[in-house]
């Protein structure tokens, strides 16, 4: 509410000159209140000070003289009194708002009308006039309070320090349309005068400086800067950009003014009239120009125009500067580079935050410190979003965006995009990903051979758009075969776990391990096919509200609720298309918003119809136009709206999996040639008729074509005449496509288009020429859903032959040839498939050393791309014959292209080299080239060094070929390094960002370089591998024992799981409690002393005979304590992750009936690729030995603990005794927390075994609430000093190892450091744990009686993550965590293994050539290893490459994804609890093969099992009668307990109450989970294995 208007304000004596207040017969007296208020403001402007109190009688003559002088020299701004200049400078400096408090004696002057009647007559809303809320610079003034109360120029509300020249304020007031203004908005309520922030719908213009010519008789008004806040303001709008009406008004003659005034007085209430501010009274002679003549009133128009243009340019510059300064503060994203300001629309412009300083050389912008107004921020964003929505979707007019929501569009693929709700449309926008070097999926699959029909297991990799298979995961450059998904027809699941990939030439059959794995592969391949065949395209879906039939919720997905929008098909009124949207931020809110929008949609006459080329005959039989691409020539208003997308052809894709192409009777695809603009109007006006005839002819000729799928029925007879009439006079507003499904077949369309990559994949091309197709007046078209798929723009330097054919001048034989080539691309026969790539290489590279001396032929390029499955963008530069050495030389030909170095063997029948007949190496992976002597006489050798791979040896018959090959490869290596990423601006990325740059949500999470599914587009729709899906928060327990290195990875994993919302707990040894809880993780203690365990392992070796004998004596009680404490620690868990070394997890999970995972730091699953980590030989012994080590270890390990474990199962867990085979440990999901770069996954591992990458824990020693870790004093100086002396710094430490002779080890280390000439950082760590009490311990000066030289800096412990990147090499014991840390830092690693898995990591480091292994620690061997690690450039470079690859991994993220993916599988293998009733039927074997035989009772099976067990024990265990149930033996393993009671059903009395007592027969039957992997093993097979 505005303040009350004082009816009788105190009289004021305004200091106006006599000329300004002279009255005559033609100048009636204005109302005194109005005059006094206005004159106070104008007087303040004349003196360039804030309004002050009225002048006294002594000051009045001086004021009159000044006013007279300035009136005479009104056109000369430089004539100002010196005191005025001083005042101006003082005011320009500014007065803080907090100093501008009015005193008590300040007088208040208010505007008021002369009478209530006149006030009501002229009570107009003043939109925008209340902004900006400027503060007066002079305190204690009546004028200041008058302005605050009347004009709402309040002093400091929502703004900071504001400088404002009063003259500019008056200029802004003069710019207001006091008379009729056609550009003004309609009046609104007076409430907006009080709250301008809510009424922010006024149009905003940028500033234009007004000409400095007098418009009133008040004399000269000096121009100065008016600093407004960065917000919408009507005053600034008129001052910045005066319209023609305003200029005519201000510079009009008295006669014109009188005429306008009288007209305004007679039509004061007319619609569209801009009212006066509240309190002002319209008067005919209020602002009549002075009588200085018409010359003064009419300045030179050219001068005015030039001044306005100049001020417009200055305002543009200042506005952009202010926008850039305040964009970050106000959180505005303007997208400047995407929407160039070609035309300045009033709705897109903001008021200048600062106006130009008139006559001043300084044109800086003063930043305004103010709080962000959220309402204005949303309004500004919505305005920009509406503009961009009109640009991107090509809407005919700007529509206000009511809602903006992220969601998914569900079809055969799931597209993530944005939904926009307007009053007339539902719009959806998605951008197809365009990423290179993207690993989509990899894993083992069986491939069926084409001739032998045998299945061979390969490691299959889906990368980019190529599906390749390899014999080994460690040989990524020699694929056995590949498939380019760009030319694939389909990928479908067949019977069992098989699926087929179909191409034009042959079919490929693959077999997965499980059906879920098969489905994931099919989904991944299908989505890559779609992405590849529509790379870089944008998907736009426009649903008019009048086409919507119903909106309802639909449980389409098993893990989320979808919203189904049903739309009527404009082509066929009997069919309804459904569009499914899911994964809204709030599904209920989105559903209610869409429903509300549909309910409140305007009536049909109010909605503009969305025209479509296929809806002109909506009531007739639908014609197939799915292959039609309609293009127009000339200009169009709609094309201007579309902007950069207006010249692109649109394609509507109906199906991805069924690329069927229509053919004519002669087998050639139909194509109508484009009509150029030289055709007459009669021909052009019948183009839609031509389209209809073409479609009808296709429909008739397809009677014998098997591509027809039977629905809808074929059209019979010619189209009705009404359709032709409609086609002649109708012109679409912009190019649209029919309403059929984008990715799935629609009931209204019987044919599907080929999902090719080219932008002109169409069998019918219709060109709209000029303005021949006119819009029909008075007739509306039925709205249809528009689906547009826009191909990427090809730049001028990459104009394709298809684009050339669409030019107007091409209507000759060349066009026919181009059409034939384009049709060949669409055909899927073997001949035309090959022809689809027959595009001449446009290589501009030099043909160095080329035998032919010219560029390669199109046929050679085609074969090259086809054989190596490369894209059409890959250009062949040259090729050479030569030999590739693996074991023996393999003859073939080497190919060099823009990005690849390839080899193809010519010895196709040479079976021993079959695996090496194909080589594809990316040039970016080449590290170097080196010429060398050949192995054979008369040849020239070449060594190719590859990053992260072994060297490759090549031979040529002549030195000239080798020289040419080296020159080309070096040229391409340099070009690839310099080019980096493509810098060409992708228009579709721009358009995608146009819709996404205004998104206010959180930033996108960084993608994992080794993702299970790199983006949601490639995620499976199943709930276990869909990345957007997260299970409900769970209580997850991690169970592990061992050293610090065994516990640390679980801390990292638990922190990642906590970030996902889960509750985590670690159960391990009690000495780690403070460390674990310091990271905010719950802790449970389990039994066992890790120091004693390590001492025994070091003394006896891992699982040797002496180790087992000592274990029989010492660790029987240790194992019982471990088992019981593990059971107690895991209570209340929803999911269990265990290290296999804990030995109890699988039994605890079975008793708790919870999903169970295993995780370990070394290989534990049987494979032929690597030996067991506890049985690594000094030299490799091959696959059979490796597999045998796992079998032997599993059997021995189980025999050693089975007696105690089975007794614990019966007495504590209430479970039956088990065997090694019954546990089925090979079916348990496994997470290996080491890098696939270091240990590539073997082919014989199943899909639920994941090599995730290292689980690094940065700053492991830090605790919550404590300050960050700092290095020991002097360590940084030691490292810097060594590097300054050009010495290498190495780390030597054996952290968690108990050394039997620490004195000898210390002396050996010191001698090796001195002899190698390096500086060392020595950490003994836990080496003192095994020492006896009372022995002296080491310090920084020495230890074990050995004095440290200056080259050694001794520490107790160190953060490896901090230290390793600062040094040159590391020597340690080879623990999994320490090895991962040194490899991650990219430094050579020396390992001295002591026990356990350390020998395995030493072997891997040596195999990768990133370090050395020392089997026996001597000073000589250690010194040699240190010298090699610090001087061998090959080893240093290889370690650097491996470090880069490891740093790109995200092991924790991949581990969590694997947990989600296999969660359902882990639940499916949970074993059922035993029955409490002998009459309970035997458990079913599988949900696929249930046992239905009624005569198989549990008693009969149990008796057979018991008899067989006893007979087995009679043969193999003669001591069965002398061994007690509680006895423990490695050989017998408690045989009597297993034979006597292992298979017997435990009575309810012997079970814990919380497990067995509540279980009845019915509960047991209903609680059974199906076993997906075949039948359960029959109990009669016996208990012992």
From Swiss-Prot:
The reaction(s) this protein catalyses: a sterol + UDP-alpha-D-glucose = a sterol 3-beta-D-glucoside + UDP + H(+); ergosterol + UDP-alpha-D-glucose = ergosteryl 3-beta-D-glucoside + UDP + H(+)
Domain GRAM: 387-555, 862-933
Top-rank taxon: Eukaryota
Cross-referenced SUPFAM superfamilies: PH domain-like, UDP-Glycosyltransferase/glycogen phosphorylase
Enzyme Commission no: 2.4.1.-, 2.4.1.173
InterPro entries per record: ATG26_PH_GRAM1, ATG26_PH_GRAM2, EryCIII-like_C, Glycosyltransferase_28, GlycoTrans_28_N, GRAM, PH-like_dom_sf, PH_domain
Major location (coarse): cytoplasm
Transmembrane domains' residue ranges: none
Topological relation to the membrane, as annotated: Peripheral membrane protein
MF terms in GO: sterol 3-beta-glucosyltransferase activity; UDP-glycosyltransferase activity
PANTHER family given in the database record: STEROL 3-BETA-GLUCOSYLTRANSFERASE
Protein name in the entry: Sterol 3-beta-glucosyltransferase
Organism (species): Cryptococcus neoformans var. neoformans serotype D (strain JEC21 / ATCC MYA-565) (Filobasidiella neoformans)
């Amino acid at each position: 509410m505005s303040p009350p208007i004082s009816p009788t304000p105190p009289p004021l004596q305004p200091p106006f000159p006599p000329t300004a207040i002279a009255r005559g017969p033609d100048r009636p007296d204005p109302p005194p209140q109005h005059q006094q208020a206005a004159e106070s403001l104008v007087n303040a402007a004349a003196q360039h000070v804030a309004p002050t109190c009225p002048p006294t009688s002594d000051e009045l003559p001086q004021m009159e003289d000044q006013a007279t002088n300035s009136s005479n020299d009104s056109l000369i701004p430089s004539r100002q009194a010196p005191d005025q200049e001083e005042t101006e400078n003082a005011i320009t400096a500014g007065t803080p708002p907090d100093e501008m408090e009015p005193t008590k004696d300040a007088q208040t002057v208010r505007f008021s009308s002369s009478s209530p009647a006149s006030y009501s007559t002229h009570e107009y809303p003043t939109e925008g006039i209340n902004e900006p809320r400027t503060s007066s610079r002079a305190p204690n003034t009546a004028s200041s309070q008058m302005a605050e109360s009347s004009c709402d120029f309040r002093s400091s509300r929502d703004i900071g320090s504001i400088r404002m020249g009063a003259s500019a304020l008056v200029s802004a007031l003069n710019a207001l349309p006091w008379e009729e203004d056609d550009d003004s908005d309609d009046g609104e309520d007076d409430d907006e005068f009080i709250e301008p922030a809510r009424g922010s719908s006024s149009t905003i213009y940028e500033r234009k400086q007004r000409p400095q010519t007098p418009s009133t008789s008040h004399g000269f008004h000096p121009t100065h800067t008016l600093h407004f806040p960065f917000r919408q303001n009507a005053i600034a709008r008129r001052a910045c950009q005066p319209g023609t009406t305003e200029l005519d008004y201000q510079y009009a003659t008295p006669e014109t003014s009188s005429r306008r005034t009288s007209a305004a007085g007679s039509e004061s209430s007319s619609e569209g009239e801009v009212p006066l501010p509240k309190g002002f009274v319209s008067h005919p002679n209020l602002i009549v120009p002075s009588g200085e003549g018409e010359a003064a009133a009419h300045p030179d128009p050219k001068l005015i125009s030039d001044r306005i243009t100049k001020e417009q340019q200055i305002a543009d510059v200042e506005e952009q500067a202010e926008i850039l300064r305040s964009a970050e503060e106000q959180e505005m994203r303007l997208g400047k580079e995407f929407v160039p300001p070609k035309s300045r629309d009033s709705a897109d412009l903001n008021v200048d935050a600062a106006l130009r300083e008139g006559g001043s050389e300084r044109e800086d912008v003063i930043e305004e410190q103010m709080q962000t107004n959220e309402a204005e921020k949303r309004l500004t964003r919505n305005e920009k979003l509406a503009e961009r929505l009109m640009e991107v979707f090509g809407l005919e007019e700007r529509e206000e965006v009511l809602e903006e929501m992220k969601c998914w569009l569900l079809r055969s693929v799931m597209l993530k995009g944005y939904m926009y709700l307007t009053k007339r449309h539902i719009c959806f926008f998605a951008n197809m990903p365009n990423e290179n070097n993207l690993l989509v999926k990899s894993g083992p699959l069986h491939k069926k051979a084409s001739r032998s029909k045998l299945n061979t297991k390969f490691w299959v990799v889906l990368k980019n758009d190529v599906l390749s298979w390899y014999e080994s995961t460690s040989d990524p450059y020699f694929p056995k075969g590949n498939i380019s998904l760009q030319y694939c027809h389909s990928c479908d699941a067949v019977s069992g776990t098989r699926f087929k990939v179909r191409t034009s030439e042959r079919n490929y059959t693959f077999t997965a391990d499980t059906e879920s794995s098969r489905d994931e592969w099919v989904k991944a391949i299908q989505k890559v096919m779609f992405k590849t065949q529509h790379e870089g395209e944008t998907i736009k879906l426009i649903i008019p509200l009048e086409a919507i039939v119903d909106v309802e919720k639909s449980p389409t997905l098993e893990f989320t609720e979808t919203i189904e929008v049903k739309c009527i098909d404009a082509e066929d009124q009997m069919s309804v298309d459904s569009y499914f949207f899911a994964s809204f931020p709030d599904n209920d809110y989105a559903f209610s918003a869409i429903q509300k929008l549909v309910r409140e949609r305007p009536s049909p006459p109010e909605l503009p119809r969305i025209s479509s080329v296929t809806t002109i005959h909506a009531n007739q039989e639908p014609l197939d136009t799915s292959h039609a691409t309609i293009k127009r020539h000339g200009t169009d208003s709609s094309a201007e709206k579309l902007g950069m997308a207006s010249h692109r052809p649109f394609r509507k894709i109906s199906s991805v999996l069924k690329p069927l192409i229509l053919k004519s009777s002669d087998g050639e695809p139909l194509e109508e040639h484009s009509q150029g603009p030289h055709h007459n109007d009669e021909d052009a006006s019948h183009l839609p008729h031509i389209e209809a005839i073409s479609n009808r002819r296709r429909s008739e000729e397809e009677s014998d074509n098997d591509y027809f799928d039977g629905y809808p029925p074929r059209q019979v007879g010619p189209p009705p005449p009404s359709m032709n009439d409609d086609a002649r006079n109708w012109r679409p507003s912009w190019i649209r496509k029919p309403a059929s499904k984008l990715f799935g077949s629609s009931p209204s369309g019987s044919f599907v288009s080929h999902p090719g990559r080219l932008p002109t994949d169409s069998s019918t091309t219709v060109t709209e020429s000029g303005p021949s197709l006119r819009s029909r007046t008075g007739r509306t078209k039925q709205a249809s859903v528009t689906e547009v798929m826009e191909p990427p723009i090809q730049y001028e330097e990459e104009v394709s032959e298809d684009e050339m054919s669409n030019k107007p001048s091409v209507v000759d034989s060349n066009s026919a040839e181009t059409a034939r080539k384009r049709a060949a691309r669409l055909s899927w026969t073997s001949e035309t498939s090959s022809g689809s790539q027959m595009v001449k290489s446009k290589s501009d590279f030099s043909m160095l050393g080329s035998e032919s001396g010219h560029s390669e032929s199109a046929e050679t390029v085609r074969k090259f791309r086809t054989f190596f499955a490369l894209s059409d963008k890959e250009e062949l530069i040259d090729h050479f014959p030569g030999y590739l050495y693996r074991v023996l030389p393999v003859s073939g030909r080497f190919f060099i292209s823009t990005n690849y170095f390839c080899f193809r063997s010519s010895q196709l029948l040479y079976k021993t080299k079959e695996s090496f007949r194909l080589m594809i190496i990316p040039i970016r992976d080449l590290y170097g080239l080196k010429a060398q002597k050949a192995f054979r006489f008369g040849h020239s050798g070449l060594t190719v060094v590859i990053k992260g791979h072994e060297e490759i040896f090549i031979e040529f018959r002549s030195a000239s070929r080798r020289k040419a090959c080296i020159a080309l490869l070096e040229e391409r290596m340099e070009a690839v390094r310099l080019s980096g990423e493509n810098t060409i601006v992708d228009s579709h990325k721009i358009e995608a960002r146009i819709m996404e740059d205004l998104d206010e949500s959180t930033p996108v999470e960084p993608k994992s370089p080794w993702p299970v599914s790199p983006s949601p587009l490639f995620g499976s729709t199943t709930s276990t591998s869909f990345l957007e899906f997260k299970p409900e928060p769970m209580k997850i327990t991690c169970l592990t024992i061992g050293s610090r290195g065994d516990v640390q990875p679980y801390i990292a994993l638990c922190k990642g799981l906590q970030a996902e919302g889960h509750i985590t707990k670690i159960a391990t040894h009690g000495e780690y409690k403070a460390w674990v809880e310091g990271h905010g993780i719950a802790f449970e203690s389990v039994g066992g002393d890790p120091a004693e365990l390590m001492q025994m392992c070091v003394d006896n070796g891992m699982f040797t005979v002496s180790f087992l004998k000592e274990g029989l004596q010492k660790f029987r009680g240790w194992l019982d304590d471990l088992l019981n404490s593990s059971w107690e620690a895991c209570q209340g868990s929803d999911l269990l992750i265990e290290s296999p070394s804990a030995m109890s997890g699988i039994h605890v999970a079975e008793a708790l009936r919870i999903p169970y995972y295993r995780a370990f730091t070394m290989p534990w699953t049987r494979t032929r690729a690597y030996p067991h980590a506890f049985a690594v030989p000094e030299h490799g012994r091959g696959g059979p030995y490796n597999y045998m080590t796992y079998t032997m270890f599993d059997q021995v390990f189980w025999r050693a603990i089975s007696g105690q474990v089975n007794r614990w199962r019966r007495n504590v867990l209430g479970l039956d005794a088990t065997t090694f085979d019954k546990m089925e440990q090979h079916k348990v999901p496994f997470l290996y927390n080491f890098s696939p770069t270091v240990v590539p996954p073997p082919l014989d591992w199943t899909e639920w075994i994941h090599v995730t990458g290292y689980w690094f824990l940065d700053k492991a020693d830090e605790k919550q609430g404590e300050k960050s870790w700092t290095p020991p004093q002097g360590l940084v100086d030691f490292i810097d000093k060594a590097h300054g002396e050009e010495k290498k710094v190495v780390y030597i430490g054996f952290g968690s190892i108990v050394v039997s002779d620490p004195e000898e080890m210390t002396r050996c280390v010191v001698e090796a450091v001195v002899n190698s000439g390096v500086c060392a950082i020595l950490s003994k760590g836990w080496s003192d744990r095994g020492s006896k009490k009372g022995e002296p311990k080491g310090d920084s000066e020495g230890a074990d009686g050995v004095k440290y030289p200056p080259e050694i800096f001794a520490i107790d412990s160190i953060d490896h993550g901090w230290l390793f990147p600062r040094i040159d090499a590391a020597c340690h014991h080879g623990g999994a965590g320490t090895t991962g840390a040194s490899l991650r830092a990219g430094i050579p690693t020396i390992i001295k293994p002591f026990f356990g898995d350390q020998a395995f990591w030493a072997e891997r480091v040596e195999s990768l050539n990133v370090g050395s292994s020392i089997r026996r620690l001597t000073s000589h061997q250690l010194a040699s290893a240190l010298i090699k690690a610090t001087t061998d450039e090959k080893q240093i470079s290889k370690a650097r490459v491996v470090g880069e690859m490891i740093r790109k991994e995200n092991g924790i993220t991949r581990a969590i994804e694997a947990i989600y993916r296999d969660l359902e599988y882990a639940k499916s293998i949970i074993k059922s609890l035993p029955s409490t009733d002998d009459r309970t039927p035997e458990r079913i074997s599988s949900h696929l093969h249930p046992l239905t035989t009624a005569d198989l009772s549990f008693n009969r099976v149990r008796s057979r099992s018991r008899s067989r067990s006893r007979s087995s024990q009679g043969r193999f265990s003669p001591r069965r009668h002398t061994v007690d149930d509680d006895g423990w033996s490695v050989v017998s393993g408690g045989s009597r307990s297993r034979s006597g009671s292992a298979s017997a059903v435990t009575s309810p009395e012997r079970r814990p109450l919380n497990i067995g007592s509540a279980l009845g027969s019915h509960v047991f039957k209903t609680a059974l989970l199906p076993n997906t992997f075949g039948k359960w093993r029959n109990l009669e097979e016996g208990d012992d294995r």
